[in-house]
């Protein structure tokens, strides 16, 4: 994927004295009092901003925050707490500018934060007049918000159409590189883990991956539907019986390519869904009518761990059991540690996956951790994200 990168423009001396508009993802969680409870996204966006400032640019940064009503400002929708936190981290005052679409005064070496872009009428519908106004504010537009790369909005897509120069910031560029490594040109064997409660929410991903991967590991409620497709009983476990045909089609598609969806040989069951429930390991053929399957068994975990250690590339989306309950966390932990020990290039994404990575402290052993959420899932579905599409188009002239 050929895109223009901010670091390339800086290296070519094209950024000094220019007005740079950065679309970041600063959509951080806040408590009821408006205090930021988790600042990873703010920290992740600072390298791009500092890069532009060091190069001598006049820098404007904006983001969405929450779900405000367009055209109606409410104090809780303001980026002021974000600017304050970013200012603490960067050791500088960051003024917040409201009603900014008609013009912003910013000098080289200066940084301002443009108020919540979703307050602008026409933002979400990618209104052309709004996008042109935004583009007129800058000489260079920098997209550095992978979390919004799957949305075609005025501040993510429209501005990139009309700005003099449109490029990717370091965060977005890293996502593009990791995705290309994992999916476009993977080192084989390519093994994917797709887990979650429902086949219905991940069906497009399962179908897309079944045409490309060498091994497709399913987990969570999704695996229960695949157990049904393999003719096994799952007791009262969470599953979608109406999607058994779809699961079978995925198994058949993999088989036709000489690949496989490994079906668990043993599972961990309980009688109730509770952190204190008694865990019992059973053969997958011995599940009782009143059993709930809450994890893969140790034998299955060992087989899958060996497959992951032998992989060339690993794509991981979702924990394979109820890892929040320690009695049902063994499967997820075993696979997480196998990914950490594997020589494969690994890319992981999705909220629960990130929580599992944090729980087992393997952040440094995963090749790339995607913070994209919905954008990451759309990439796995084989879709071309609007942000990638417009930046590629602009790079091609």
From Swiss-Prot:
Q: What are the alphabetically sorted keywords of the record?
A: ATP-binding, Cytoplasm, Glycolysis, Kinase, Nucleotide-binding, Transferase
Any idea of its EC number?
Answer: 2.7.2.3
List the disulfide bonds in this chain: none
The pathway this protein participates in, as annotated, is: Carbohydrate degradation; glycolysis; pyruvate from D-glyceraldehyde 3-phosphate: step 2/5
Looking at the UniProt record for this protein, which Gene Ontology cellular component terms does it annotate, in alphabetical order? cytosol
Which Pfam families does its entry note?
A: PGK (PF00162)
User: Do the record's keywords include Cytoplasm?
Assistant: yes
**GO BP annotation list:** gluconeogenesis; glycolytic process
| Amino acids binding ATP | 202, 324, 350-353
Record-annotated residues binding substrate?
A: 25-27, 41, 64-67, 118, 151
Protein localization:
Cytoplasm
Q: Which GO terms describe its molecular function?
A: ADP binding; ATP binding; phosphoglycerate kinase activity
Task: Name the predominant localization.
Answer: cytoplasm
**Record's subunit section:** Monomer.
- Tell me the protein family, please: Belongs to the phosphoglycerate kinase family.
- What is the protein name for this chain? Phosphoglycerate kinase
Q: What is the name of the gene encoding this protein?
A: pgk
